From Swiss-Prot:
Interacts with host ephrinB2/EFNB2 or ephrin B3/EFNB3 to provide virion attachment to target cell. This attachment induces virion internalization predominantly through clathrin-mediated endocytosis. Residues 71-602 are virion surface. Homotetramer; disulfide-linked. Interacts with host EFNB2; this interaction allows the virus entry into the host cell. Interacts with host EFNB3; this interaction allows the virus entry into the host cell. Interacts with the fusion glycoprotein; this interaction involves both head and stalk regions of glygoprotein G. One of its GO terms (biological process) is virion attachment to host cell. Belongs to the paramyxoviruses hemagglutinin-neuraminidase family. This is Glycoprotein G. Changing residue 24 to I: In strain: Isolate NiV/KHM/CSUR38. The N-terminus four-helix bundle form the stalk and the C-terminus form the receptor binding globular head domain. Residues 96-163 are annotated as: Stalk. N-glycosylated.
Length: 602
């Protein structure tokens, strides 16, 4: 796709540029950082990083001096053996220096970057929020007791000299009143209405980035469970699809009510992988105050696009949502994967934002790479009876990213048992053949007492694909027959297409079930026929859209959307992450919207 094209072609790769809309929604969203800021510890780490830099500079000076000595020596002698030994010594010094840069400088520079861009802004924002809440409470008391009205305190307009803010050391966020959707149905509007009853609220949040113009924030992940969340993104400079990978953020935290009865997020623990350009397609599952994050590791680029050359390596990281001071391996821990049981598949990897736990077992959404010649499918099962131009072989040929690709892709789950002890492994479980389409990003989550599975529509079956999980192993889904939600598309697979064709295009826009009796769900979808634009928060049934709210202007480009719904003080709320092009600098960045599901239809 041409970089200069302002419309986003609806393809499976992130486009380089979006258009600058006429209407810009201002916000800064991302991740608040570590709630415990130990100022002395922070200073000591920064000092340690500074000392390391000085030591490395000294090493460089010594190496340069050695080279100068050798140059002088070569002018006065022909002893090539001595010169060779000296050069080998310098090579060893350079290798040691490079190793030290990778193992010592990189992480400490990342520490400084994280501290300056996440920790300090997060706690200043939190302190300001607490001050605003306190002053509002004081005003209410004075107004009630004294029978006159105090003007609101405008913190940023006070003509006083304010001291530098101290770290908010004593704050301990607690997840109160936040829970999963369980039990009996909640009271929500069940009727179709054109009234603007949805009131999306942009969550004001500080992005954990350097913030320079042109930084593209892509490949976002947002998982939520039991009042805790995991978040991840990749930063690129120069281009959203081919730019230089600067850093990947993987963090966890709590869903909070900051005093205004609107859910927000407070990040408590952040990890930045040392090699961000090798980490792809992370997925997170919560269990007992930890998030387990499973990622693909690749040195040849995206494993989906470079599957033939990808080694199949995976990485598991455990992050504590309530980290301890000096917690070390408790707070952030790399888990060894002794084996990967792939069955008949060549390679497998996580593919989708989040999964579920059942007892001691974690299930991550995944995709398997199967050699095309080993894929057995009866073409007579291809649903073409109502399609005039579709061919029986189209179902089979559309299972790869190209008709002649070496691998076909199948969705499924990766199972990880926490009780495996010293021999941890992941096991791939493939999805059943019913309503089969190419493997794509998916999500499995618990809602109202039963797991629900969503799979992105990346091929000819463009209608939303989700339903109750009947069995996990093997993975069998009772797919809903939805007729109102579809994704934009071009070529052979346009919006609302249901005839088997050979294509590979689509986007991840999941839905969260909020009422099981009436099968009502909520999510953000792109209300456009051909281009990825116009994100709209929508509450819908299988055959009817009940009510909706636009999150940006109609021509605002957007892509991936992730929605998680939960109870906050017995009210249904949803938080939606939206990849969106409306920041004013021609790059895509995610935003968070909080939406309360209304009880009344008026």
């Amino acid at each position: 796709m041409p970089a200069e094209n302002k419309k986003v072609r609806f393809e499976n790769t992130t486009s380089d540029k979006g258009k600058i809309p006429s209407k810009v929604i201002k916000s800064y969203y991302g991740t608040m950082d570590i709630k415990k800021i130990n100022e002395g510890l922070l200073d000591s780490k920064i000092l340690s990083a500074f000392n390391t830099v000085i030591a490395l500079l000294g090493s460089i000076v010594i190496i340069v001096m050695n080279i100068m000595i050798i140059q002088n020596y070569t002018r006065s002698t022909d002893n090539q053996a001595v010169i060779k030994d000296a050069l080998q010594g310098i090579q060893q010094q350079i290798k040691g220096l490079a190793d030290k840069i990778g193992t010592e400088i990189g992480p400490k520079v990342s520490l400084i970057d994280t501290s300056s861009t996440i920790t300090i802004p997060a706690n200043i924002g939190l302190l300001g929020s607490k001050i605003s809440q306190s002053t509002a409470s004081i005003n209410e008391n004075v107004n009630e007791k004294c029978k006159f009205t105090l003007p609101p305190l405008k913190i940023h307009e006070c003509n006083i000299s304010c001291p530098n803010p101290l770290p908010f050391r004593e704050y301990r966020p607690q997840t109160e009143g936040v829970s999963n959707l369980v039990g009996l149905p909640n009271n929500i509007c069940l009727q179709k209405t054109s009234n603007q009853i949805l009131k999306p609220k942009l969550i004001s949040y500080t992005l954990p980035v350097v913030g320079q113009s042109g930084t593209c924030i892509t490949d976002p992940l947002l998982a939520m469970d039991e009042g805790y969340f995991a978040y991840s993104h990749l930063e690129r400079i120069g281009s959203c699809s081919r730019g230089v990978s600067k850093q990947r953020i993987i963090g966890v935290g709590e869903v909070l009510d900051r005093g205004d009865e609107v859910p927000s997020l407070f990040m408590t623990n952040v990890w930045t992988p040392p090699n961000p350009n090798t980490v792809y397609h992370c997925s997170a599952v919560y269990n007992n105050e930890f998030y387990y994050v499973l990622c693909a590791v690749s040195t040849v680029g995206d494993p989906i696009l470079n599957s033939t050359y990808w080694s199949g390596s995976l990485m598991m990281t455990r992050l504590a949502v309530k980290p301890k001071s000096n917690g070390g391996g408790y707070n952030q821990h790399q888990l060894a994967l002794r084996s990967i049981e792939k069955g008949r598949y060549d390679k497998v990897m996580p593919y989708g934002p989040s999964g579920i736990k059942q007892g001691d077992t974690l299930y991550f959404p995944a995709v398997g790479f199967l050699v095309r010649t080993e894929f057995k499918y009866n073409d007579s099962n291809c649903p073409i009876t109502k399609c005039q131009y579709s061919k029986p072989e189209n179902c089979r040929l559309s299972m790869g990213i190209r008709p002649n690709s070496h691998y076909i892709l199948r969705s499924g789950l990766l199972k990880y048992n926490l009780s495996d002890g010293e021999n941890p492994k992941v096991v791939f479980i493939e999805i059943s053949d019913q309503r089969l389409s190419i493997g794509s990003p998916s999500k499995i989550y618990d809602s109202l007492g039963q797991p629900v599975f969503y799979q992105a529509s990346f091929s000819w079956d463009t209608m939303i694909k989700f339903g109750d999980v009947l069995t996990v192993n093997p993975l069998v889904v009772n797919w809903r027959n939805n007729t109102v939600i579809s994704r934009p598309g071009q070529s052979q697979c346009p919006r609302f297409n249901t005839c088997p064709e050979i294509c590979w295009e689509g986007v991840y826009n999941d839905a969260f079930l909020i009422d099981r009796i009436n099968w009502i769900s909520a999510g953000v979808f792109l209300d456009s026929n051909q281009t990825a634009e116009n994100p709209v928060f929508t509450v819908f049934k299988d055959n009817e859209i009940l009510y909706r709210a636009q999150l940006a202007s109609e021509d605002t480009n957007a892509q991936k959307t992730i929605t998680n719904c939960f109870l906050l003080k017995n009210k249904i709320w949803c938080i939606s992450l939206v990849e969106i092009y409306d920041t004013g600098d021609n790059v895509i960045r995610p935003k968070l919207f909080a939406v309360k599901i209304p009880e009344q239809c008026t």
